[in-house]
């Protein structure tokens, strides 16, 4: 659970309070944004000591081995107002690797 305490003027960096770990975290899309936020006095919400270390990026693979794929997508024009249509190769569906998409409204056909 995160709460936003402060945001840099350009919106690139934020100070988040992480209640699960009782920590304030400087978040930025890139390392430079975090460094600039650290040096910008208008960015700080209070005078606190900061432990500055290397950026931490958490990578998690939740589906086990083989869940990531190299995908090729082909786009083709359709008649105006006809909506959208997704098609996939039948052998993949038969193996059950992505069967959770097939029976949902607007799902794969």
From Swiss-Prot:
GO-annotated cellular components: chloroplast
Keywords: Chloroplast, Elongation factor, GTP-binding, Nucleotide-binding, Plastid, Protein biosynthesis
One term of GO molecular function: GTP binding
Protein localization: Plastid, Chloroplast
Residue intervals passing through the bilayer: none
Gene3D superfamilies per UniProt: 3.30.230.10
Pathway(s) it belongs to: Protein biosynthesis; polypeptide chain elongation
InterPro entries, A to Z: Ribosomal_Su5_D2-typ_SF (IPR020568), Ribsml_uS5_D2-typ_fold_subgr (IPR014721)
Main location as per UniProt: plastid
Domain of life: Eukaryota
Family: Belongs to the GTP-binding elongation factor family. EF-G/EF-2 subfamily.
Record function comment: Chloroplast-localized elongation factor EF-G involved in protein synthesis in plastids. Catalyzes the GTP-dependent ribosomal translocation step during translation elongation. During this step, the ribosome changes from the pre-translocational (PRE) to the post-translocational (POST) state as the newly formed A-site-bound peptidyl-tRNA and P-site-bound deacylated tRNA move to the P and E sites, respectively. Catalyzes the coordinated movement of the two tRNA molecules, the mRNA and conformational changes in the ribosome.
Protein name, as recorded: Elongation factor G, chloroplastic
